[in-house]
């Protein structure tokens, strides 16, 4: 095999690949045997017709095309490795010569990973945000603890209050006509959660268990279902059940009940320490992000459209998987939100480009600085990850390799080391 490479435009090269005549001839012979097993050739049992008869029966072009299909992928990857390029899209292939007994020659136009022109990335000055815990934040954390340990009371009687969980049946209509998604039975709604359209929840306050209530609302002008935007609606609502949370007072007894501490002051001190640790971690992460952002801003790189589109595809795949957990798909999501796949792709484009630039710049810095991840470091990180997922490092390693994600995982560790390097150099 021989490979000639020509740069035809930015981020695009053309490979002219010459495959040995013996390799192509062997591929033709193999293709002939495969075709002999598939087609019925008069006078011969399946698989017994000689190559000349197969070629005469199916045609030279069909035979040679099968041979090329069989070896093109392998020969292309050999050429890519020999040329030392990193394709980011499928090649555009043209066959130049395809004759038995002669070399197979093809050209492949390939979009490759772009070169990064690094700017300043050492000694970057970024102010670190001071980690602070306010009394208000501590109070909010105490309230969260109070919420977590609240008792839920199933009321036999009483009226709906704010923060109650009310179980309701409802049927909505616009101009007397029911609409899709406007009817449900046994629905649990937290009053004040804002999960229904404005005005709905407030009109249930004061209703009694078993009571039927007419709720009049107007759909917002920007409502996700276009047909309902700005429309007046009537909901017939029946209150089935009522739940209310009972909160323990914030005192020493509360501290004893939910923690190892004897007093509320001790609990507060512990919570403040934990909040401070979290605040320091956030400040550190913000500083890291700011340093990386500056290094990326100082660099220049022209990202091929194919790379951006591929990344958008990945982002949409992730989104589709997350939606599937809610019993939805992208098409349904687009319908509910009044958008389209094209609009979503364009909205994701800036983030996809920004993420790619960050990855490429970090990769370029790692290459210049010789930052790598050793097998020992890789195995140590795999062990930590395996412990988190309650599996063995070997099982995790096999799973990553089976999905073809090991290279991506290793690169993420290299990127992490590179970020730490930038912080150390700042």
From Swiss-Prot:
Its EC number is 5.2.1.8. Its main location: cytoplasm. GO terms for molecular function: peptidyl-prolyl cis-trans isomerase activity; protein folding chaperone; ribosome binding. It holds the Pfam family FKBP_C. SUPFAM superfamilies: FKBP-like, Triger factor/SurA peptide-binding domain-like, Trigger factor ribosome-binding domain. It comes from the Bacteria. InterPro entries: PPIase_dom_sf, PPIase_FKBP_dom, Trig_fac, Trigger_fac_C, Trigger_fac_C_sf, Trigger_fac_ribosome-bd_bac, Trigger_fac_ribosome-bd_sf, Trigger_fact/SurA_dom_sf. Keywords: Cell cycle, Cell division, Chaperone, Cytoplasm, Isomerase, Rotamase. It catalyses: [protein]-peptidylproline (omega=180) = [protein]-peptidylproline (omega=0). It is found in: Cytoplasm. One of its GO terms (biological process) is chaperone-mediated protein folding. One of its GO terms (cellular component) is cytoplasm. It is an enzyme of class 5 (isomerase). Residues 163-248 form the PPIase FKBP-type domain. Involved in protein export. Acts as a chaperone by maintaining the newly synthesized protein in an open conformation. Functions as a peptidyl-prolyl cis-trans isomerase. Belongs to the FKBP-type PPIase family. Tig subfamily. PANTHER family: TRIGGER FACTOR CHAPERONE AND PEPTIDYL-PROLYL CIS/TRANS ISOMERASE, TRIGGER FACTOR-LIKE PROTEIN TIG, CHLOROPLASTIC. HAMAP family: Trigger_factor_Tig (MF_00303). Consists of 3 domains; the N-terminus binds the ribosome, the middle domain has PPIase activity, while the C-terminus has intrinsic chaperone activity on its own. This is Trigger factor 1. It comes from Desulfitobacterium hafniense (strain Y51). The lineage of its organism: Bacteria, Bacillati, Bacillota, Clostridia, Eubacteriales.
């Amino acid at each position: 095999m021989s490979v000639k490479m020509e740069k035809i435009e930015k981020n695009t090269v053309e490979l002219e690949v010459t495959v040995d005549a013996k390799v192509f001839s062997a591929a033709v012979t193999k293709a002939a045997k495969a075709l002999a097993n598939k087609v019925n050739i008069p006078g011969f049992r399946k698989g017994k017709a000689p190559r000349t008869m197969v070629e005469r029966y199916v045609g030279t072009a069909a035979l040679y095309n099968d041979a090329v299909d069989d070896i093109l992928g392998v020969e292309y990857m050999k050429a890519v490795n020999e040329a030392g390029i990193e394709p980011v899209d499928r090649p555009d292939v043209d066959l130049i010569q395809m004759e038995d007994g002669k070399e197979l020659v093809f050209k492949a136009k390939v979009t490759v990973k772009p070169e990064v022109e690094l700017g300043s990335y050492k000694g970057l000055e970024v102010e670190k945000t001071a980690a602070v815990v306010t009394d208000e934040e501590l109070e909010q954390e105490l309230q969260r603890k109070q919420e977590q340990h609240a008792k839920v009371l199933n009321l036999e009687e009483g009226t709906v209050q704010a923060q109650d969980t009310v179980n309701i049946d409802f049927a909505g209509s616009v101009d007397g006509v029911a609409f899709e998604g406007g009817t449900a039975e046994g629905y649990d709604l937290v009053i004040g959660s804002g999960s229904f359209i404005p005005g709905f929840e407030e009109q249930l306050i004061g209703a009694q268990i078993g009571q039927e209530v007419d709720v009049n609302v107007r759909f917002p002008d920007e409502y996700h279902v276009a047909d309902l935007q700005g429309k007046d609606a009537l909901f017939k609502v029946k209150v089935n059940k009522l739940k209310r949370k009972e909160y323990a007072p914030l005192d020493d007894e509360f501290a004893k009940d939910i923690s190892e501490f004897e007093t509320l002051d001790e609990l507060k001190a512990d919570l403040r320490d934990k909040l401070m640790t979290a605040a320091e971690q956030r400040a550190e992460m913000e500083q890291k992000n700011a340093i990386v952002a500056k290094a990326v801003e100082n660099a220049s790189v022209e990202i091929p459209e194919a790379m951006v589109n591929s990344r958008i595809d990945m982002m949409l795949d992730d989104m589709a998987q997350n939606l599937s957990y809610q019993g939805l798909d992208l098409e349904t999501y687009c319908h509910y939100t009044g958008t389209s796949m094209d609009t979503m792709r364009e909205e994701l484009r800036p983030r996809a480009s920004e993420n790619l630039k960050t990855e490429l710049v970090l990769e370029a810095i790692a290459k210049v600085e010789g930052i790598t991840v050793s097998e020992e470091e890789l195995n140590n990180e795999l062990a930590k990850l395996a412990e988190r997922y309650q599996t063995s490092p070997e099982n995790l390693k096999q799973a990553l390799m089976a999905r073809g994600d090991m290279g991506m995982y290793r690169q993420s560790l290299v990127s992490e080391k590179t970020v730490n390097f930038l912080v150390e150099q700042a």
